[in-house]
Amino acid sequence: MDLNKLAEALVPDENVKPLEYYEKLYPERDLPKGAEVTRLAPSPTGFMHLGNLYVAIANERVAHQSGGVFYLRIEDTDEKRKVEGAVEVIHSSLKYFGITFDEGADLTGDYGPYYQRQRAEIYHAYARDLIRRGLAYPCFCTEEELEKTREHQTENKL
């Protein structure tokens, strides 16, 4: 199988740039040794839940105590469940609990965009590369088939 042809067929985006472009655009951060870069990536599907709040507190502390960076990226890929105004709720909820970001959604930063849907071109470039190298493969399952598989695995504790 010609993996280059497969990669082009699966990821035909003409806007995809070479990986070197993205590596130059997003160089390694100039941070102190031991500094951690952490993120919170909630989905704008309603109110913040305790799981997101817990992760936000832990990640903010780890990043800031290590001299690193804490950023907010919005996982806005689930259009079916997206709730209008949810991003604002996320911001106000985190602000209420005193959680601050160094960069991210609705803030400046050199490593954006910070909305998942706006990063598609980047993901396409890396997906294409993985397919070309034989490290990723396509799945043509329907949502129904995946759900059936998930149910089977859950029932059988697989």
Where do the PLM segments sit?
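N-terminal Rossmann-like or analogous alpha/beta NTP/dinucleotide-binding catalytic cores
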Residues: 2-155
